[in-house]
């Protein structure tokens, strides 16, 4: 396996663990969301919205962790890429369309993580394409 894919796998595990922490925080205390993320319109944040956000974050976390375990599963790889694209779209729309988020570190951090992850996963696609060919050559 290429060094890049190993780094990408480590990155996915790290992001997954952080997301697990965010999930727990969303279930434990919904003020986390309006104090850190949705600071533009905190009155729209309630317990139900926080738990929904927590489940969405948990699902993304599980998908990313599974991709790190089985990085050569192309379907799982593409689904994982979509988790980052959806997160990027969500936070950008909350920031620029709905005005529920302000450009604070609480929003900029997930935007940067999603952006770097998308970039890394797009680069990783090239390594996934090359690797199966090299495996077949070794067998022959």
Curated annotation (Swiss-Prot):
Gene Ontology MF terms: identical protein binding; protein-macromolecule adaptor activity
Principal subcellular localisation of the protein: endoplasmic reticulum
Tissue: Ubiquitous; strongly expressed in testis and some cancer cell lines.
Protein's GO biological process: sterol biosynthetic process
Regions that span the bilayer: 4-24, 52-72, 79-99, 105-125
Entry keyword set: Endoplasmic reticulum, Lipid biosynthesis, Lipid metabolism, Membrane, Steroid biosynthesis, Steroid metabolism, Sterol biosynthesis, Sterol metabolism, Transmembrane, Transmembrane helix
Recorded GO CC terms: endoplasmic reticulum; endoplasmic reticulum membrane; membrane; transport vesicle
Subcellular location(s) per record: Endoplasmic reticulum membrane
Membrane topology: Multi-pass membrane protein
Disulfide bonds: none
Family assignment from sequence similarity: Belongs to the ERG28 family.
Listed name of the protein: Ergosterol biosynthetic protein 28 homolog
